[in-house]
Structure formats: C-alpha cells, structure tokens
C-alpha cells in the first residue's frame, strides 16, 4: 500500500505523462495536416490516383493498414518538397526544425527524428523507393501509436473539414 507521499508522487508523474502525450498528439496532428498540403501537387506531378486520399485521410487510424504503393510515392514527393529527405535519406536537421515549427519542444522533436531514423534503418532495403517509403511510414505510424501520440480520427477529420 502506498503512503501519502508516494501517492502524491505517483499522481504528479501520471499527470506529467498525460500532459506530455496531449501536446505530442497536437504536434503530430499539426505536422500531418501541414505535410499533406502539397498532396494535390504531388498527385498531379506523379499522375497518382485520387484513391490515395483515403490513405492520407485515415493514416493515423489504428485499424487502417496502408498498402498502396502510390501512397508511398506521394509520401516521398511530399517529404522531398518539404526538404525532409535527401537522396541519401532523412535530413535530420530539417526534420527537427519541421517538428519544432509545429509545436514540438527540443525533446519531442528529437524523439520524432529518432523514430524516423530508426524506422529508416529497420525497413528492408527494397529496390522500389515508393514501397520502401511506404514501409518507413508504416513503421513510424506504429511507433507513434506505441507512444500514444497519434491524433484521433475524429480530431483529424474535424481539422481537415475546417481547412476546406
């Protein structure tokens, strides 16, 4: 049984963890909404079908599995436009700044970069760049869900409707 001091300490730790999760969800939400702004341009440039919109709309849904190669191509195009990647992989500095621009503090921004870097290293070395990026994105999504940083489907839908 916990004494009063232990109980207070436990409550403080739980509260601080909760407060860390909510702002992180906001960061991921804001990053995602900004990330997809160039989607129409990428679809036009790469002649991608409108069917990939569903993958972007439902990306953070835990039950949605992204398998469409075209979605990987769009993610690569968007990442390039935002200068988050180079020919050799993730641009750590630009990605760190991108996260900070969307509300992340230094710690959260670095954790996002670390997750992306870890996922980049973890995916198989596929010859098809679009499929490799798709696997990278799926890994990142899974890691964000483990941290409970994924924005809810309801919040994302409301934000997307508000932008229309």
UniProtKB/Swiss-Prot annotation:
Assembly mode: Monomer and disulfide-linked dimers.
Family membership: Belongs to the PBP/GOBP family.
Name of this chain's protein: Pheromone-binding protein 1
Protein's organism: Epiphyas postvittana (Light brown apple moth)
This protein's record includes keyword Lipoprotein: no
One Pfam family named in its UniProt record: PBP_GOBP
Protein purpose: This major soluble protein in olfactory sensilla of male moths serves to solubilize the extremely hydrophobic pheromone molecules such as bombykol and to transport pheromone through the aqueous lymph to receptors located on olfactory cilia.
Organism superkingdom: Eukaryota
Tissue specificity statement from the Swiss-Prot or TrEMBL entry: Antenna.
Keywords: Disulfide bond, Pheromone response, Pheromone-binding, Signal, Transport
Gene designation: PBP
Signal peptide boundaries: 1-23
GO molecular function: pheromone binding
């Amino acid at each position: 049984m916990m004494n009063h001091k232990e109980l207070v300490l436990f409550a403080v730790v739980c509260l601080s963890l909760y407060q860390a999760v909510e702002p992180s969800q906001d960061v991921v939400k804001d990053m995602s909404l900004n990330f997809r702004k160039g989607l129409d341009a990428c679809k036009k440039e790469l002649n991608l079908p409108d069917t990939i919109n569903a993958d972007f709309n439902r990306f953070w849904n835990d039950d949605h599995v992204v398998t469409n190669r075209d979605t990987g191509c769009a993610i690569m195009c968007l990442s390039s436009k935002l200068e988050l990647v180079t020919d050799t992989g993730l641009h750590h500095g630009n990605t760190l700044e991108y996260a900070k621009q969307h509300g992340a503090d230094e710690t959260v921004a670095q954790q996002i970069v670390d997750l992306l870097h870890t996922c980049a290293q973890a995916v198989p070395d596929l010859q098809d760049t679009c499929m490799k990026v798709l696997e990278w994105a799926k890994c990142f999504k899974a890691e964000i869900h483990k941290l409970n940083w994924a924005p809810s489907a309801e919040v994302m839908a409301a934000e997307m409707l508000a932008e229309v």
